[in-house]
Regions:
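Active-site bordering "gate/hinge" segments
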Residues: 1-261
């Protein structure tokens, strides 16, 4: 589910970057591919965005009988379209003029703010929670973070493109490993506290939680990766023309609501 969500959102963000550079075709194609993926999600998990599918101890529903076939089918469609879209993106002169060298985030700032996700990896910070803090099944998949040093809008787009391919390969591997069995485990009814890190499509999502003696939530604090990325967007737009702000903003795609959690 994490990798399917990553593919869908990276497609959306890549297309939106092109659209903010006044080049609508990739936006339209990425939108069609994302829609096809969301429909496959609905077939497999009962919800286009897979909402309420993850519960404490596991998942709420098992993948539908026809779910794996639906997901493989849409991955095949994306894999067929992706090379052509990348070629158009890389060879369209006016688009490249807008994204290359625009909104540069310096590597030292990315490191100082511990920026994760696309923002950090596009500025040379090779941190990925799937690699650094792996939970199952990532501890068996051997994730290698993709990082490049340029730090501009183009770099953030290229990281997304590369991660779409990586995530598609991971989904195929995971579908091949699925076996029948329980879909969630019973939780102990006891107190305690802990913290977890999950690599979302924007970066690492941290959640601290404290339980009372009955196992009920006493306190919880989620931290969205956008907390560390909004100040860096401010630094990245310095020296750019006003017309390039939408490009910079969309290439970061920080969450407005995430910082209010």
């Amino acid at each position: 589910m994490l990798e399917l969500e990553r593919i869908a959102n990276h497609l959306q963000d890549w297309g939106a970057i092109c659209n903010d550079a006044s080049f609508a075709y990739p936006h339209a194609r990425c939108g069609l591919l994302r829609e096809a993926l969301l429909r496959a999600n609905a077939i497999a998990f009962g919800h286009r965005l897979m909402m309420d599918a993850v519960i404490p101890g596991g998942v709420a529903v098992d993948i539908a009988a026809e779910g794996a076939q639906a997901i493989r089918g849409v991955l095949d469609a994306i894999a067929q379209d992706l090379p052509g879209l990348v070629r158009i993106y890389e060879t369209h002169a006016s688009l490249q003029d807008r994204v290359v060298g625009t909104g540069v985030l310096r590597a030292e700032l990315a490191a100082r703010f511990a920026a994760g996700g696309v923002v950090g990896r596009a500025s040379g910070r090779a941190f990925d929670a799937r690699h650094a803090l792996p939970h199952a099944p990532y501890d068996e998949l051997g994730i290698t973070p993709i990082a490049i040093p340029e730090g501009d809008v183009d770099a953030r787009a290229r990281i997304r493109i590369a991660e779409i391919g990586t995530s598609m390969a991971l989904v195929r591997r995971l579908l091949g490993r699925l076996e029948p069995g329980p879909i969630h485990a019973p939780l102990p009814q006891r107190g305690g506290e802990g913290i977890a890190a999950v690599e979302g499509f924007r970066g690492e999502i941290l959640t601290w939680m404290s339980l009372d003696d009955g196992g009920l939530i006493r306190a919880v604090f989620p931290r969205d990766p956008s907390w560390l990325q909004w100040p860096l967007l401010e630094a990245a737009v310095e020296g750019n023309i006003v017309a390039d702000f939408p490009l910079c903003n969309k290439s970061f795609n920080c969450s407005y609501s995430g910082v209010d959690l």
